[in-house]
Amino acid sequence: MKVLAFEDSVDIEALLIGNGVDLSKLEFKQYWESVDHLDRILQFDPDVLMLDHYMPPTKGLDVLVNLLKSNIKKPQTIVAMSSSSMANIAMLKTGADFGIVKFKVSELEIWTHHS
């Protein structure tokens, strides 16, 4: 499983590992800003896309909108992982599959199904 995260302040891979998620069978990549987000998504072709809302220069919600309007294949799972529940709700309404406070992403069932 390939996981791509756009998050500017928290090391998501370290957070997952620190909370007991086995990433040994996953390919994980994180970008700390959202420059060229569509090209990055296209090149990496993730199964799981994780989006922080408050991230420069393009917010996670706008990354999601741009992805859904593009011809790029939609990842199997899109996770909204803002520290703001309102931002997560906005991304869920737009097309994200899960909305969770970023510090709880290790609790998602996707890690047990794919690891």
Protein language model annotation of sequence segments:
Residues Q30-V48:
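Acidic, metal-coordinating helix/loop segments flanking the phosphotransfer/catalytic sites
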